[in-house]
Amino acid sequence: MRRVRVGDEVIVTAGRSKGKQGKILRILGDERVIVQDVNMVKRHTRPNPTANKPGGIIEREASIHISNVMLYNPATEKGDRIGFRRLEDGRKVRYFKSNDEIIDV
């Protein structure tokens, strides 16, 4: 089970996008994530007439190392550390370490 999942709200803790908040769009391998509207880069693309795509400068999200994001805790309105716990019925769930609130229900 991963500490962060697609759709989780995270805060960037390091780098040029430090302090920004967004949802995880994709997880690349074991170490990198793409966060919505964070770490934006510009890519220059050529026009492709066969695919009917115009050229130009496109702005998109670049990946961030997973150690540079923390899960956003709405109760404390900050980034928070994550722990794992087993419930009475045997399910493994994530919880916030600061206030013991369960994330996965």
Curated annotation (Swiss-Prot):
CDD domains: KOW_RPL26. One of its GO terms (molecular function) is structural constituent of ribosome. Signal peptide: none annotated. GO terms for cellular component: ribonucleoprotein complex; ribosome. It holds the Pfam family ribosomal_L24. InterPro entries: KOW, Rib_uL2_dom2, Ribosomal_uL24, Ribosomal_uL24_KOW, Translation_prot_SH3-like_sf. Part of the 50S ribosomal subunit. This is Large ribosomal subunit protein uL24. It comes from Nitrosococcus oceani (strain ATCC 19707 / BCRC 17464 / JCM 30415 / NCIMB 11848 / C-107). The lineage of its organism: Bacteria, Pseudomonadati, Pseudomonadota, Gammaproteobacteria, Chromatiales.
